[in-house]
């Protein structure tokens, strides 16, 4: 309220067709302005009539105002900020939102590396932040709105996600039990970051299923997930020599020179799943998109490993030859254990 007459002493606010009211005193400190909050009020539109009175009890002319009370119904339809990216940046995570110009900001809640839950407000003018979150841990964020003339901020429903694990580099670890290559599709293509090149075994070399390849990670890693990209160009997805069933193995010991499984631990058995469930040779757009995006798997036997081995047990087309384009491994890097003997 703003007022100029020093003789005003009190006032009354009416609403709900004068069924409800609130009396208030007008400050005598000469400030000429003050505010009054009516609470609680149910969500909705309101019309208000205000009377002021001087020290002799004479009323003013009625002043009429309108206003809106926001609440759960309004908050339930609030838009949430679009998350553009969550990326690993060295030992921290970079987060960026988009389409936030009409919003006040975002409240991000996450677990930091000390094990504490932190809440960070990110203003829409910034729309990005860097945090020391735990890889693989859950985060949530709400979007803060402040409608025009509102005295309070309103909060959207929370969006929940997980911070990604770190992608670990690796190379081929040469052993006599690694399946030979044909057609010039070398196993090094599995870790070159190029989805147009891959590894291809063949029946001509005498190789029969299962086929296997051994890898050394750049550093010991607590593995949590991996992704395999099958041959999905043109109409190759979910047919021919694309892997259908396979196992993943790990060890921290230097692999035996004969390439045997001694000292290795099976981390899990995995199977490629075609989204449509249609017979081999029949593809939907969703099948193709799924194959090209790569198939991700959680590793049930989580542990810290330096060496990995994949064994392909069955192909989609029932063929003995196997082909796929790329492998990616994700987890939490650990310090070196002293093993540094590469067989490249």
Regions found by a protein language model. Give the residues of each.
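Beta-strand-rich modules
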Residues: 38-62, 129-161
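Low-complexity, Pro/Ser/Thr- and charge-rich linker/hinge segments at domain boundaries
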Residues: 70-89, 161-183, 334-344
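Recognizes extended acidic, P/S/T-rich segments that occur
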Residues: 10-44, 107-136, 268-270
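Aromatic, loop-rich ligand-recognition surfaces of beta-strand-rich domains
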Residues: 194-261, 291-344
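Hydrophobic core positions of the immunoglobulin-like beta-sandwich fold
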Residues: 38-39, 97, 130-131, 215, ...
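An aromatic-rich alpha-helical recognition segment common to small helix-rich domains
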Residues: 1-2, 13, 38, 46-50, ...
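Extracellular carbohydrate recognition and processing domains
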Residues: 262-298
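Conserved aromatic anchor
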Residues: 1-7, 91-102, 228
């Amino acid at each position: 309220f703003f007022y100029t007459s020093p003789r005003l002493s009190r006032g009354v606010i009416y609403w709900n067709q004068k069924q409800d009211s609130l009396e208030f005193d007008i400050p005598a400190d000469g400030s000429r302005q003050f505010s009054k909050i009516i609470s609680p009020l149910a969500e909705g539109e309101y019309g208000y009539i205000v009377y002021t009175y001087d020290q002799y009890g004479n009323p003013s002319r009625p002043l009429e105002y309108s206003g809106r009370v926001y609440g759960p119904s309004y908050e339930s339809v609030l838009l949430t900020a679009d998350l553009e990216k969550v990326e690993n940046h060295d030992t921290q995570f970079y987060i960026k939102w988009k389409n936030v110009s009409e919003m006040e900001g975002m409240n991000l809640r996450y677990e930091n590396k000390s094990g504490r839950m932190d809440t960070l407000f990110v203003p829409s003018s910034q729309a990005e932040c860097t945090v020391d979150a735990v890889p693989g841990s859950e985060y949530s964020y709400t979007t803060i709105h402040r409608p025009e003339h509102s005295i309070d901020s309103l909060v959207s429903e929370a969006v929940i996600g997980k911070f990604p694990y770190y992608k670990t580099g690796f190379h081929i670890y040469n052993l006599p039990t690694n399946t030979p290559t044909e057609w010039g599709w070398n196993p090094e293509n599995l870790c070159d970051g190029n989805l147009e090149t891959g590894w291809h075994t063949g029946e001509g070399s005498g190789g029969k299923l299962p086929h296997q390849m051994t890898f050394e990670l750049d550093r010991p890693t607590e593995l949590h997930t991996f992704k395999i990209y099958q041959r999905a160009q043109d109409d190759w997805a979910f047919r021919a020599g694309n892997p259908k069933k396979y196992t993943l193995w790990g060890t921290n010991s230097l692999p035996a020179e004969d390439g045997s499984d001694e000292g290795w631990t099976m981390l899990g058995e995995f199977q490629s799943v075609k989204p449509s469930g249609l017979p081999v040779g029949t593809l939907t757009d969703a099948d193709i998109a799924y194959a090209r995006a790569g198939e991700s798997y959680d590793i049930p036997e989580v542990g810290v490993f330096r060496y990995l081995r994949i064994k392909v047990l069955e192909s989609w087309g029932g063929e003995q030859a196997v082909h796929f384009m790329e492998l990616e491994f994700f987890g939490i890097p650990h310090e070196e254990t002293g093993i540094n003997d590469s067989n490249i």
